[in-house]
């Protein structure tokens, strides 16, 4: 870390929001932090989505609106003073009136300390104010407060409280109060003998107030203890200006006894903490040395005020705020500090739940033995006296390894089951194979969940004990399946232990499977056990669901009648008789698990589906009626079950597996609801009322309370699990969603019932988030337990607990602060990242090398060389790795001096988080040696005559100063392989030092000054991005409904460069091995030197005039991987520019890339020439330069249209790419104007797409460009929609064009319509549009045009001319319509009550399909008659069959048609099956049933089978690729995991600057 970056200060943020619970926080600000980063830091500590942030400077200066300066460095904001404590004001969004002269009254809190009393009324002399303190060079500065206190009476300390509290016993005289204000600390500077004190006026935050209040005591021994409380961020003391006035403070002396007592108390503080002592001349051994410098990742590692975010040094304790952690720290309300009675405010229930009421004070030392953990625990009464309202942060989440949400949900439910957790704690580990022992790893995980200071803990140790490798984390599984498999594994491991019957005692119930003869009433039973009860959501074959789990349970025990051909052979009657077959519950388990079977199979569509129907469940469930069966219970059950179909909730549809419910064939059930369903909204408000009657009627032990709801969100093909769980200690409900734990309400629980949202497609748009598994606990005062507290842990757990924490601390210290998720399959891996600059893509790529054996740098190089495809640039012999700090974009050193291939010392010095940079060299060059302690420079190459620029290139130099020097010049010349005397060099001061070089064979001071001026004004804030652009030819733009832009005449005589010139190199001149040819930048500088340089006075008024160090403002991000490497030339010299002769310059001049926007003679951007003056300040000059990239890197690009057809995806596929160098302070409006000129598409008709569908809105004309440096943007063509506009995909249907090779209807274009567009208007617009696209649509007219509404992949409705086009506002999927060109004699507008079908004739004699035809059936039409009219088949010889597949149903094999049993030949009308289950647009086959099928020989069958297979592959590879069913792996837990061989592998390379 450089000196510049190590500068930091503290700011206080005062929340002025009415009703705010957190009035003030403190934030650490580094010198390289942008305003936006500071706003983001503050936003993590408040629940507001948006807020106004103002800076209230000192000396009554005007307020500064920081929201308008987001890209500016915080240190450079006018009024921000790093030497002082700055104050930020947080206001609700839109509430500031813009009055900059207003001053906010800020509550400056001071620490209250009760006065230390002396006996005999004597006063000790105070030390002289301003006493000189000497500091030995090399020692750390010791922060020493200059405060003291005195009292007329003698001070004593209570020995009983000395280990638990830092207190000063005092006895004060009545009616006497004294206040003494002192400074909090003395700060001595290196090289100075005096450490001036800060006055309270200069640093009010550093003031300490010592109060003595009126108290009385019964005896000198029974004294009231006073708490010493300090401000939360004592570490963040601001340095004091030397010019600050020094005031003498009248401090009362502290007697020797008091100082000795204070010394004893302060020794209890943990090491590494900075403290403020009230003693002015306390001995030096009372003070702790300075904490280490803060890192950029510390906020994410523990700066939150949450109790789960403590570091390893604080066991169970809440932070006191003097932590050496960067970031935000909450400040306690003054009402909770230093109460008169010496007690603490009440502690919340959930915090007691986590820590069991056994808290250690925040300043108490961490215990290292099991006895210490228990003996140091306080009582429950003391715990309740702690600070309240810590919120659900007291619960710890579980890290999702990849797709292990199902595992996390079940583990949290088991952890929150007191009986299971306590029993697991009672189990004792008795062998040495820890890694493979499932109960032991589960026990450790539960201890972590109960005691860890983290926000979330890992599950990798547990999954390794399952025998899972890394691929298992990427498999989706069912939570109910996992529950059964895990319980089986635990039972196996618990054998021959005291917990052998744990699973059966808690979760096992019993039922009788019976058959009862209805003639002799003989009943045969077989007892079965169950761990969960699977409840169908719908009765078999029904489209209506059970309304509640009680109904489903009654249906579960409803007997089946065996009659007819299925009669029961009664042994007593000696004959077949009618019988009842069913289930009786014999006993229910203590923990009852109900599994709602929401996943089913639709035999019509032949797809898996998810049933999202509404099924209610109570919080109190009485099951005694299912055990206490009366004689007529069967009749009662029968009667109840008979009403299921009538009284259940309406069909809410099913979630199709294909494309998350949007792509399959959906059968819409009846939309009618039972009248009782009109009260669905009121259903379940009193969730216990549904069993209130049964609770009264059925008495017994089986009364249950709900405590866990496992929820699935998604479709049958995949989704996400999370859990709602109740804490039995406080009866509060929480949502456990992987790492996040939040409070929920009863409304959240009711929403988990499921049910429809009430849209046109009830089956396709039903809410897919609903309860999947429920857990109830039996209400039994004798058996119900509470979770074990720390003090109640068994002895072996008390021994394990400190070991667990020690392992965690060791892991943290070994891996350092940049901790990565451990790979499942490779437990002891070192996984370095290797970076490489790809010159073809002009961007940095990254791969991660997995080393499971002893580390060897040569193996890492070989693996990275292969994965990063470096072989196309240089052989392995000309490659090397250098040590690299990816978080800071800096080279650490080269490795020539390291003789150890394991790099043991270097890796240890970097906390084993060392990354590498892969470099290669030219054949005639040698690698440069990089000594340690150098500086990495960003070097840009610029041609001042054309303003062409490239870079940045990483150049490592031993030059420590951040100015141009001979050392830096030599490093640049060596690295870029150019003459040291033939280039100009200019530098700018920045967080990352930048240098700009320009070729000049005869450099002059004037030319150098010109370059330096340009660097200071135009170049200092340059960053870079990549832009992927699709095809923008006329045909493509017409299909997408996008117009073109007329070429703008060049202003100021600038050239307009056409698309061919955007490549930067003339055809045939491009060479990937010399992509950065220095000749491209050699220009005669005489002409630009004769032109006037930019006016610096004018520039000072531009947007970035107040920013002297803004070059990194755009790239700040909390994810360090995004900053790794920059877009830098990291290979050594292989593609470095070569020096060339002057004769080459003229030839290379034509290859020079010009910026597509226009530059005037001095190179500054003339914004007014192409940008609306309303969008930009008139004086704004921002740099913009684009150069075409040789290769298009489409990795990591996304689309906001998540459901694209193959044709559309091909249209939008990037065909060319550019590298953009842009000034960071450019407005989005100007940025898009440049892109508009670059791609010749109006700004209103394209979007800039980021990865993960994160669009940059077109409405950001007044916002700065906030992008991640080096990230790739993708141009997505399409009109920016107005509020009432919608985008639709248009497909074309002409029956004559469809054959067996047609897999689906082609998407011919996109079209924008509004909410008032009718089908008739749509016909006119679409016919005209299709005529413009292609001549093959010339026969289409408004008269023969029909518009279908497309649902999924089938046509579902014909729109009448006066009908408005439909759009579901809640769906992010674009609406789709089909334009059909109807054949002659076909009515484009059939009746509303008719049924239009597409039919094909099947010829069994030829084994061939006929052409597509269309028929329309009226209400009284008979399908055979209609088919006979379009064919020569008599009506009595016709057979027909419905095809259940996606339109046009060409994926059926000709060999299987004759074998189908679904042919019908009976008369059928619309009210009879199968037409009553048919929708408009379905496809039927028909045939002459009297024609026999052709008999094939073996050879003919073989040939036809091969031909059909090839055809289906051609059809299926297009139509089923996205919908191909994933091959599922069975969930297994291996009780004996095999060892895996060690090797070295590398991950696939990816873009460094993309959010992953």
From Swiss-Prot:
Biased composition (Basic and acidic residues): 191-200, 1109-1125
SUPFAM superfamilies: Cysteine proteinases
GO cellular component: cytosol; nucleus
EC numbers, comma separated: 3.4.19.12
Positions of post-translational Phosphoserine modification: 172-173, 238, 1131-1132, 1140-1141, 1199, 1201, 1205
Effect of a null allele: RNAi-mediated knockdown in the adult wing results in the development of wing margin bristles. RNAi-mediated knockdown in the posterior compartment of the wing reduces accumulation of arm, resulting in reduced expression of sens and wg. RNAi-mediated knockdown in larval wing or eye imaginal disks results in decreased rl protein levels.
Subcellular compartments: Nucleus
GO MF term set: cysteine-type deubiquitinase activity
Biased composition (Low complexity): 146-156, 180-189, 688-697, 1128-1141
Keywords for this protein: Hydrolase, Nucleus, Phosphoprotein, Protease, Thiol protease, Ubl conjugation pathway
Active-site positions on this chain: 405 (nucleophile), 720 (proton acceptor)
Pfam families from the UniProt entry: UCH (PF00443), USP47_C (PF19718)
Catalytic reaction(s) noted: Thiol-dependent hydrolysis of ester, thioester, amide, peptide and isopeptide bonds formed by the C-terminal Gly of ubiquitin (a 76-residue protein attached to proteins as an intracellular targeting signal)
Signal peptide: none
Binding partners and assembly: Interacts with ttk.
Function: Ubiquitin-specific protease that deubiquitinates target proteins to regulate different cellular and developmental pathways. Functions downstream of Dsor1/MEK to positively regulate the Ras/MAPK signaling pathway. Likely to modulate the pathway during various cellular and developmental processes including rl/MAPK activation by the receptors InR, Egfr and sevenless/sev.
PANTHER family: UBIQUITIN CARBOXYL-TERMINAL HYDROLASE (PTHR24006), UBIQUITIN CARBOXYL-TERMINAL HYDROLASE 47 (PTHR24006:SF702)
Protein name (Swiss-Prot/TrEMBL): Ubiquitin carboxyl-terminal hydrolase 47
Lineage, uppermost ranks: Eukaryota, Metazoa, Ecdysozoa, Arthropoda, Hexapoda
